[in-house]
Amino acid sequence: MVVFKYIEPLFSKHKIKNSNEYGSARFSTFNEINKNFKKEEVRRINQVGFPIWFDKDYKKVWMDNETPHWVYLGSTGSGKSVTQVIPFCSFLSSAELKRSAFITDPKGEIFNTTSKMFQDRGYEVLTIDFRNPEKSNKLNILEPIIKEYEKHILYEKKSLEIQNKKKKVEYNNKSMSSLAETNRLISSLADMIMKDKVEAKDPFWNNSARQLLEGLIGFFLEEYKLGNINRNQITMTSIRKFQNSSMDEKNFEKFKSYLDTKKYGSKSKDSLTSVITASENTYKSITSVFGSKMSLFDDVNVANVTSSSDFDFDILGKKPTVLYVIVPDEDKTYFTLVTIIVGLLYRELVKLANIQENKKLTYQIDWLLDEFANCPPLVDIEAIVSVARSRGMRFHFFIQSFAQLNNVYGKDVAQIILDNCGLVYLKTNTQDTAEEISKRLGKQTIESNSISQSVSLTDYNGNKSTSLMARDLLTPDEIKQLHYKMIIFPIIGYPIFRDTILYTKFSCYKKGNINRKIDSLKDLSYTYFIVEDINHENKSKDYNKENLSKENQQFINEKLEQDKLLFEDIDNYIAEVYKDVVYETNYKEVNFQTYLNIESPKLLSNEDILNISSTFSEKYYIEFDNSSGLQIINIHFKMLGL
């Protein structure tokens, strides 16, 4: 007797009892889509969201306005631009409720196909174009820092000029608040530039390079306040050139000597002292890391685009605006600029949202970030995806694979991003990504038919049995074989399976790009501030007493008298040290801060210096200098909390 057995798995065509026993995964039905999402007429869209579904004539679209952000997963050739970005721009530009857009556009394709459509529909169209810098708008990435520091200078000046004591206190507090915000902005920018993918094994070098950048930005601002440089000299390229010039031994000593004249409590002094006093080998290693991160600002195209600003950083929240950032995708160095620009604009827009009554931007914003995982990590991305929606901002992150996202942010942070976003699957060539999508879809329960047959010379018996088994809704291999299809995972309901649709199918799309003004690229060397330009005599010329009114001169003199009390204890201590020796005591003022200067022909012993330092170091910054043959002691009161 011969026995044959055949097992036949089938998708059941009739109702299966206990149909969820091994899994209940399925795709969303049209009735569920119609219930969960808002239907709009393509020609008359009221509020744009993510396009979940279309009718067969592409005249109606169902929008998802609930999912806060989206991650698009598509390898090269998946049609991200023509089936996702351009259609979304068509809906966005034509919607009655206007939103702004920030679009990274590596090839310039999005600009070429959508810019005229945006302009014709009332949008301000801006470009930051590193491919064609002669056609680009300008964006000095230090602009928010400069503006905040100028507020500090303005309020400080007002605190001197006004006679009302209550107002003096008010302006002084505003000045200190702006100074603190300036320092926060400096730290944030330096972190964006110096941050590595994931976390470096030895963060010392990156942290030190960041500290060097913070100090140099602070130094340029202080020189601007003193009147030693002009506003247009405060650029990242100028800072890069200054650091290059300081590598010359003679220049380094000159810079170090000049820095010694600055007071503790200044950004430059506090940040640079520990860096430039490091050992020679350590300092060279720090500047090597600094140079590798800052080298992109040597690029003539980058220097021209970032030499000034011709629009406000928060314009996207004030009026319907589309900003295209066009970067050469063949050179990943430029992607650093995308991260910096996104980080800066996002921070300024959050500040704008926070002063609105409802804490939301008047014109809400979609960030369409192509090649997101090719960019260096965006600082505080976890916080961004958690709170951006409440400020009126929605992010669209385009990546090629999950592994690419993990490589940039690490698995933990990458998971936080994914947990806060809907997912759009377009195409993958990697098995790991296909397996992850299959896992997300889950398993369904299907019937499995088993057929047994026995045959002999005299008899034939047949037997068929049916059982239930689990099956992937789509297997990894099936997912990899999909063409012109997409799988959408919104935060509401089951996943959605539909065709990808070209932008030309939609009646709201209008082709064309705008003509941009062509400017001449410049040799900007005349704007660079380098070590050779330092003039020691200029270091304290802001608000020179001789240039102030009599009332303000009197105010400064009164302040000096009041501040003497701050130094009473150390003054008395040093009087005991020098009780049998003639010495001179002077109270001086620099940048509206009083310090105690002591000079004596008697040099202090190492023991005296140690005793003074250990006794008063918590309250004062103390500098000892005897290089001139005199003992000079400069004592600065520590401003606690600043």
Feature names for model-found ranges:
Residues 51-57, 61-393, 408-411, 478-483, ...:
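P-loop NTPase motor domains
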Residues 1-78, 82-90, 95-97, 134, ...:
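Basic- and hydrophobic-enriched, low-structure N-terminal and domain-boundary segments
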